[in-house]
Amino acid sequence: MANRSYIYLKNGDEARILTEGIYTIPYFWQLFWDEEDLKAPIALWETAEELEEDEEQAERFYQEQNVDILLPIEKFRQSALQNRSFLEENVPQALKLYDAFVRYILANVKDGDVLGFDLLDVVFMDQVSVVADKLLKNIRAIRENQPKDLDFSLTDENLIGLAMGFPDYYASELLLEDNILDSDAYQDELKKMNPQEDKKVLDMTESDSKGNKPRVLLVFWILLALGMMWVLYIIFS
């Protein structure tokens, strides 16, 4: 199973996934943060890293602590607008998708929502200290408009996978307003994707999101057949 990161709208115990990164932390997300937003999560990631060899302690830790980055919606709105100029100057071809993505998030906000980022699986692909340094370096590079200092490339054409993240398979059911799947920006970028390599990634997101649906259908048909056999047995016995 792939290491994934998620951006989602959180309201109490409810989480509505917007998009997911596969083996990466999409760079649009990083335009929404500042150093203060990462301070507490990084400390928790470091603690989690120390507990990884003790499954019992690690499980208890995850039950007691939320290790995700959580942003108030208004702060997200301000950061998204403020850092848009970074894209406008350095990667203008990404603006159409970025604007559609921000609009998609804001259109689906409910009262009491916060914007969450679950990065732990991707963070743990390396040492926490290494990943934390890269994220903080990226935040500074964006703030100071120094694209050469970024830890990711702005020239890669796969904006869906590397910049926005892949939309959740069930997004159309959970997040109905300004659905990113229906936007011209998303459809335009989808056409640019490598039809072979990127289809594999899309298939991974779809199959994981579908979960055990084929298995459930198989059980349903087996039970239906057994039920019909039982009815026939009663009728003809």
PLM region spans:
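Short, extreme N-terminal segment that most often corresponds to the first beta-strand
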Residues: M1-K39
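Acidic, proline/glycine-rich low-complexity IDRs
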Residues: M1-S5, K10-N11, K110-W230
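Low-complexity, flexible helical/coil segments
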Residues: A15, K39-T47, L150-L159
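Low-complexity, serine/threonine/proline-enriched polar segments
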Residues: K39-N90
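Leucine-rich repeat
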Residues: L106-A107
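Juxtamembrane boundary at the C-terminal end of a transmembrane helix
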Residues: W230-S237
